[in-house]
Amino acid sequence: DFKDWMKTAGEWLKKKGPGILKAAMAAAT
């Protein structure tokens, strides 16, 4: 289920830290 996957991804990002999220945002812009 996609929602479950998004929840898992969200938890993973929290554990890995905001650095990965910032990198993803930078790559998207």
From Swiss-Prot:
GO BP term (any one): defense response to bacterium
Pfam families hit by this protein: Ponericin
Tissue: Expressed by the venom gland.
This protein's GO CC annotations: extracellular region
Record's signal peptide: none
Superkingdom of the source species: Eukaryota
Cellular localisation: Secreted
Keywords: Antibiotic, Antimicrobial, Fungicide, Secreted
Function: Has activity against some Gram-positive bacteria and S.cerevisiae. Has a non-hemolytic activity.
Family: Belongs to the ponericin-G family.
Protein name per Swiss-Prot or TrEMBL: M-poneritoxin-Ng3d
Naturally occurring in which organism (per UniProt): Neoponera goeldii (Ponerine ant)
